[in-house]
Amino acid sequence: MSQSDILYSQAKQLIPGGVNSPVRAFNGVGGTPLFIKHADGAYLYDVDGKAYIDYVGSWGPMVLGHNHSAIRNAVIKAAEQGLSFGAPTAAEVEMAQLVTELVPSMDMVRMVNSGTEATMSAIRLARGYTHRDKIIKFEGCYHGHADCLLVKAGSGALTIGQPNSPGVPVDFVKHTLTCTYNDLSSVREAFEQYPQEIACIIVEPVAGNMNCVPPQPEFLPGLRALCDEFGALLIIDEVMTGFRVALSGAQSYYDVEPDITCLGKIIGGGMPVGAFGGRYEVMEKLAPIGPVYQAGTLSGNPIAMAAGLACLKEVSQPGVHQRLTELTDNLAAGLTKSAKAANIPLVVNHVGGMFGIFFTDAETVTCYQDVMNCDIERFKHFFHLMLDEGVYLAPSAFEAGFMSIAHTDEDIQRTVNAAARCFAKLK
């Protein structure tokens, strides 16, 4: 047995499923999850001493690569001053200043501890601001595990919320409407059915939790227009895309201005951090200056602020996003070419430092149903073949891949060469 096998066996006796977040259990691909000992740059090293080119990046935060010296040194320096104060710090002010400079749609920002906290709080704020209860989310989009967002989408353009997790009462999600990603007609149908009741739309500008599905050109501007028409707020969930698709986020890349933005992952540089922010008149509804309550014992934690500031300062350097996009483009082109040579039908979606691999005969993948029509079993086989080659992809056909600027041209070529060998075995 490997050390990962031994540790997983022990973990399953102590931790539900042996993991602290379900996707880590490899249920989407089968087998034993890797237990990681350390990481550096573009590489993970498991407890058995094997190295892997990493395209998970801790599920997005590691845009600079693992164990970046600037972040590590900032954390050490901050920790020497104390771990948590429960009081304001200068670092919080500096972080707020930097974030609002980088994301112009955010006049004010509130720090929290996770992406889930950010989206949950943003929705509460939107409801408090508009005095409306219903929200629109999209089939296949994930915004954290808050009760009102754990909704199963059925067939058809519009689904009145039904929870897809035991423990979530139907009453908690009855105000959640689910529409089809990249389908504006389904959104208009929802607004026309409830013209005075919808508080907000919450959307991933690039859907990253049904693998990687970019928006069609008209989709995000269309959502903005519908929100304006019906008096709802537009919440763009940039937990995954923020500072990765572009320096100012996917909202700048696609030229759409939200009322509220949610951030996470990269903003913490690997530490647990989230944030949400928006226009003055919306954010001023938050306690302690407004009636909408939100709080957190560890919000604005000084260690997390130090890590996030160091990360954002590095990400803001000239050429970072150009290089990130170049690496991702080269990987996508190489995978596509290798699959074609092996007569394996493949679609590779990519934008900025995100990508998604789909085994499908379809020409495009633009929504959840397209993703569900892909060959999931072939992906499982491909995942394990690539793992044997020393390439670590997301262990699920429904999760995006992430590039870092620590990846080299040699890493990309090694990955493409490995994929070519794996495609040949898939025939």
From Swiss-Prot:
Q: Which UniProt keywords apply?
A: Cytoplasm, Isomerase, Porphyrin biosynthesis, Pyridoxal phosphate
Show the GO cellular component annotation of the record.
Answer: cytoplasm
Provide the catalytic activity annotation: (S)-4-amino-5-oxopentanoate = 5-aminolevulinate
Q: Which domain of life is it from?
A: Bacteria
- Residues with the modification N6-(pyridoxal phosphate)lysine, per the entry, are 265
Q: Which GO terms describe its biological process?
A: protoporphyrinogen IX biosynthetic process
Q: What is its EC number?
A: 5.4.3.8
Q: Which cofactor does it need?
A: pyridoxal 5'-phosphate
The places in or outside the cell where this protein is found are: Cytoplasm
> Which pathway does the UniProt entry assign to this protein?
Porphyrin-containing compound metabolism; protoporphyrin-IX biosynthesis; 5-aminolevulinate from L-glutamyl-tRNA(Glu): step 2/2
Alphabetized Pfam families for the sequence? Aminotran_3
The entry lists its GO molecular-function terms as: glutamate-1-semialdehyde 2,1-aminomutase activity; pyridoxal phosphate binding; transaminase activity
Show the NCBIfam families listed in the entry. Answer: hemL, PRK00062.1
The family line of this record is:
Belongs to the class-III pyridoxal-phosphate-dependent aminotransferase family. HemL subfamily.
Q: What quaternary structure, including any partners, is listed in this protein's UniProt entry?
A: Homodimer.
Protein name in the entry: Glutamate-1-semialdehyde 2,1-aminomutase
Q: Which gene encodes it?
A: hemL
